[in-house]
Amino acid sequence: MSATSSPQQSEGADFTQRVTYTFMIGVYLAVNAIRDLYLLIEGPDCTYMKTQYVQGNHDWLSTLTSVSGLHRIANTALHPAQMSGSREESLQATLQRIASHPAVPAVALTSMPMAFITGAEYARLTRQVARVSGKPIIHVQGKSLSGDWIDGYAEVLLSLARQLDLSGGSPCETKA
């Protein structure tokens, strides 16, 4: 490596600090924009508090959290002590409980890196809950380490496009 090149240039990967919102904030922004979509994050409690980035700074009318207690963002309260055991059964039960609520039309499931690396089969879990609930349950890959907010927003849209069955649908009439 020459004196003028940086490690980021020579290695091909850029691990410098970002001055932007995170991947997960982009996921929240997408969920905020789709009023029929609820989100379960396999991750610690701090994931819930990140809703303030949207509600406090971006959209004061956001419905991601509600004084009624029916929040559109939920988490599994994953703690590092739980990481070594299988969590799929409890994760599926939580996802099923959210999907079974009559006010919930659709649910997305994503994960923080600490959960993703343990190998839970999120796509299988979402398919099983969708089959039982009869509602769309979408798996959004947890790519928090590889992108920023716009990547998170795009990943939600890509996941919806790939996983929603739109056959038999019809365009909405435009309101004048």
Describe the residue ranges of each PLM region:
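An N-terminal assembly and electron-transfer interface module characteristic of large anaerobic redox
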Residues: 1-176
